[in-house]
Structure formats: C-alpha cells, structure tokens
A protein has these predicted regions:
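RNA substrate-binding interface of SAM-dependent RNA methyltransferases
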Residues: 71-139
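N-terminal positively charged helical leader segments and presequences
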Residues: 1-69
Length: 139
C-alpha cells in the first residue's frame, strides 16, 4: 500500500480520520508506523496529500489529514476485455487501476466459460474493492 485511501464521509470537520480496518493493520504491521509518522493519503474521487499519525491504539489509528495535491489524471485508455477466469480478473482490475486505465469493458466471447459470469467477483462491491487495492498500490 503506497497511499491510504479514504472516503469523504470518513473525514471529520477538523480534518481527522480514524482507521480500524485493513488500512490500520497495514500501517501497524507492514509499515510499522508510530505516532508522529507521516503517510501519503488520498480521498477517493478527490485530491491527495499527507496524514500525520496522531495516536495509535491496539484497534485504531487517528490521522490528521492535509489535502494539498491534485489527483493524477487518468490515461485516456479504454480496455475491452473478454471475461477471464475470476482469479485473473481480480489481478487485471488491480493492474488497470494502478496504470490509470480510464474505461474497462468486460464482454462475452466464444471462449468465455459461461460459469465465469456467475462469479461473486463480478458484484459491484467486489469490483470496487479490487480497483481500490490497485489504486492503493499506485500511490
């Protein structure tokens, strides 16, 4: 994770966010952050900046967020993709988000197994999650 992404609804009026999910676990276990450290943050569908760790408990981390950078533009690229195996689709979606692909169209073709269309990965929530993981890696 090269950037901590958050929803606008998570940001309080005093520019703070509290994390208690996988983002918190990553900051604690992988990055080994401590109070006072700065991390890159970005608002989903918004700008990016830095966040300073105010406090860390055994369950949450509080960040003070300063948004001061414009978001990177998307590449004007459209990907037309015959539905691959579900495991590969997750990887492809992550990579597309990392590279800033603007549009992704998933289509059926002669060689696509019909059972692939029943995959839970095609649920909007799962697609969004795969794209967010890619965005977090892109930084």
């Amino acid at each position: 994770m090269n950037i901590v992404l958050f929803e606008a609804s998570e940001l309080t009026s005093d520019h703070k966010i509290t994390l208690a999910d996988r983002r918190y676990a990553h900051l604690r276990d992988v990055l080994k952050c401590v109070e006072g450290d700065r991390v890159r943050v970005g608002m989903i569908n918004g700008a990016k900046g830095t966040g300073q760790i105010l406090s860390m408990t055994t369950a949450t981390v509080d960040l003070h967020v300063e948004i001061n950078e414009a978001p990177l533009p998307c590449h004007p690229t459209t990907l037309v993709l015959a539905l691959p195996r579900p495991k590969m689709l997750r990887r492809i979606l992550r990579s597309c988000a990392e590279f800033g692909v603007q549009d992704i169209h998933i289509i059926h073709s002669y060689r696509v197994e019909k059972s692939f269309w029943q995959s839970p990965l095609l649920e909007p929530k799962k697609i969004r999650q795969a794209l967010l993981v890619g965005l977090e890696r892109s930084g």
